[in-house]
Amino acid sequence: MNKETLLKKFGKNVKIERIKKDLTQEQLAEIMNVSQNYIASIECGKANMSLGKILELAEYMDVDINLLLAFEK
């Protein structure tokens, strides 16, 4: 699996969990102190998050980090 595919799968997982939590991109961006465009870029697989930010995201969304990092083929 290449980097582009992983980023897209990660972004899809973020979007799924965000929607389950009934959060808009704007709300999540505000919670994480980032722009809505950054959240949109993550969900589209165009932004690469650091491990620290991924941990933060999991905490803010109250989800197991493994759900965000589940990369099925």
Regions found by a protein language model. Name each.
Residues M1-K9:
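A detector for short, charged/polar N-terminal pre-domain segments
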Residues E4-T5, L67-K73:
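Short, charged recognition helix plus adjacent turn
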Residues K8, I19-K20, A47-N48:
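Short amphipathic helical patch at the helix-1/turn junction of helix-turn-helix
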Residues K12-I31, E56:
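Short basic helix-loop element that most often maps to the first helix and adjoining turn
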Residues V14, L28-A29, I39-I42, L68:
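Conserved hydrophobic/aromatic packing and binding residues within compact polymer-binding modules
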Residues N33-A47:
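Recognition helix of helix-turn-helix/homeodomain-like DNA-binding domains
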Residues G52-L67:
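DNA major-groove recognition helix of helix-turn-helix/homeodomain DNA-binding modules
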